[in-house]
């Protein structure tokens, strides 16, 4: 059982670790891709603005024909040359605020009209530099935010890895607390440091049964001195076991309630109604045939007794009286059978009407119960699992199972007061076990081959 739990927990941990690594890789890749795209976009934009400026500065003087009066005020170098009293360094972009632009504009406005046209194109270029600088500054701030996000993701992933390793230690319950603290992040090393399993003595009771009972007792009593993660696991198992037992106890508690309602509430009313408004004595033809057969057998016995006991008296005076008493007894017997039949039908209808809403509204508890039963089944060793499967299949679809199905079908017919049909029972016995056997084989092929192939091998070996 310990090896099975260890392999199952190891597989679950490996799957969770793989999913977490893939998710972390996607997050890292997306953030780094976004960061690289922002950096590349800023570099390209800055380079494009710079080269465009250099191209405009290299244009000849004849481009300024629309403003011929500017030649008098500036040399014939370029129409975009800055004034001598305010040099502009285009080698590095600087942050230029709106206030500085407005001050420069107002200061240059007092000059002659020849300078006005120059200021328009110049401050247009300076506005481009300002917008570029602000954009780059904003992107740099975004890069800092991205770096902080990456650091936060690394911290969270480290913490998550630490807690995952703590949970993984529950796979190896024989590892002490010192090893747990010394190796919080090394799963493979923890595997290598496991202690050997203590030898268990052989007894008449299978060890898997004793281990299952011990585990069940530990889940209920919480007698565990393991670390925090193992303690949480036992708390979860304890809650699962308690919820399952409470749900089963609640369903079993319905049977005493059903018996109480049947005896104290339904039976007096049904009995009074049947005795007052009785239409016929027999509810079906099958009861009538059985009553007639029993009456004939009783009359034959009475006649034989009278003949043997009264050899001298040939009139047989007591025969009619005994036959009449037997008829009255049979009538009372079948009358009681009909009352019990109506009582069972009413009780079953109330039980079904109560049970279905409980199952529908208690789907979560039913799922917990299902998982708990599966866990108890899979906690057994492979031999016990194969033995349980063989026992169930032989009882339901084995060589002698048709006789049991016939008895079950006839009992159901009698329970509900129906007439047995000579065609329904053979048809059911010949088809239903075959369908059930097919479902068993499909379950073994589809489910057990994936979860535990060793169970399938043991099952085939035991069945052969």
From Swiss-Prot:
PANTHER family: CHLOROPLAST ENVELOPE MEMBRANE PROTEIN, CHLOROPLAST ENVELOPE MEMBRANE PROTEIN-RELATED. It is a multi-pass membrane protein. This is Potassium/proton antiporter CemA. It is found in: Plastid, Chloroplast inner membrane. GO terms for molecular function: antiporter activity; proton transmembrane transporter activity. Contributes to K(+)/H(+) antiport activity by supporting proton efflux to control proton extrusion and homeostasis in chloroplasts in a light-dependent manner to modulate photosynthesis. Prevents excessive induction of non-photochemical quenching (NPQ) under continuous-light conditions. Indirectly promotes efficient inorganic carbon uptake into chloroplasts. Keywords: Antiport, Chloroplast, Hydrogen ion transport, Ion transport, Membrane, Plastid, Plastid inner membrane, Potassium, Potassium transport, Transmembrane, Transmembrane helix, Transport. Belongs to the CemA family. The keyword Kinase does not apply. It comes from Adiantum capillus-veneris (Maidenhair fern). It catalyses: K(+)(in) + H(+)(out) = K(+)(out) + H(+)(in). GO terms for cellular component: chloroplast inner membrane. The keyword Ion transport applies. It holds the Pfam family CemA. GO terms for biological process: potassium ion transport. The chain crosses the membrane at residues 36-56, 241-261, 341-361, 389-409, 425-445.
């Amino acid at each position: 059982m310990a090896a099975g739990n260890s392999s199952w927990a190891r597989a679950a941990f490996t799957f969770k670790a793989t999913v977490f690594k893939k998710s972390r890789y996607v997050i890292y890749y997306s953030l780094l891709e976004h960061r690289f795209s922002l950096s590349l976009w800023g570099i390209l934009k800055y380079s494009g603005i710079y080269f465009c400026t250099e191209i405009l500065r290299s244009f000849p003087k004849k481009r300024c024909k629309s403003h011929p009066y500017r030649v008098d005020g500036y040399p014939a170098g370029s129409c975009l040359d800055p004034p001598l009293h305010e040099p502009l360094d285009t080698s590095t972009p600087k942050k230029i605020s709106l206030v500085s632009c407005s001050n420069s504009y107002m200061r240059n406005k007092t000059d002659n009209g020849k300078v006005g046209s120059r200021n328009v194109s110049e401050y247009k270029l300076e506005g481009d530099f300002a917008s570029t600088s602000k954009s780059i500054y904003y992107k740099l701030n975004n890069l800092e935010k991205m770096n902080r996000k990456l650091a936060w993701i690394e911290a969270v992933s480290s913490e998550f890895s630490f807690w995952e390793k703590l949970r993984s230690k529950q796979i190896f319950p024989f590892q002490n607390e010192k090893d747990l603290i010394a190796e919080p992040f090394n799963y493979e090393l923890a595997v290598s440091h496991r202690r050997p399993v203590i030898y268990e003595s052989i007894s008449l009771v299978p060890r898997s049964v004793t281990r299952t009972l011990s585990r069940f007792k530990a889940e209920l009593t919480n007698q565990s001195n393991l670390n925090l993660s193992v303690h949480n696991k036992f708390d979860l198992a304890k809650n699962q076991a308690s919820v399952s037992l409470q749900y089963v106890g609640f369903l079993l508690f319905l049977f005493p309630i059903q018996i109480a309602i049947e005896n104290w509430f339904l039976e007096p009313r049904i009995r009074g109604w049947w005795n007052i408004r009785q239409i016929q004595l027999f509810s079906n033809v099958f009861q009538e045939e059985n009553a007639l057969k029993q009456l004939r057998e009783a009359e034959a016995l009475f006649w034989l007794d009278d003949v043997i006991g009264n050899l001298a008296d040939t009139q047989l005076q007591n025969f009619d009286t005994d036959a009449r008493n037997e008829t009255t007894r049979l009538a009372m017997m079948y009358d009681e059978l009909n009352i019990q039949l109506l009582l069972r039908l009413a009780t079953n209808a109330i039980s079904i009407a109560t049970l279905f809403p409980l199952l529908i509204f208690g789907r979560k508890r039913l799922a917990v119960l299902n998982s708990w039963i599966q866990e108890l089944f899979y906690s057994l060793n492979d031999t016990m699992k194969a033995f349980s499967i063989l026992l169930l299949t032989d009882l339901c679809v084995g060589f002698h199972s048709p006789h049991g199905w016939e008895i079950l079908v006839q009992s159901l017919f009698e329970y509900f007061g129906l007439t047995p049909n000579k065609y329904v029972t053979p048809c059911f016995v010949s088809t239903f076990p075959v369908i059930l056997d097919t479902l068993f084989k499909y379950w073994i092929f589809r489910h057990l081959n994936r979860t535990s192939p060793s169970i399938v091998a043991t099952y085939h070996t035991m069945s052969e």
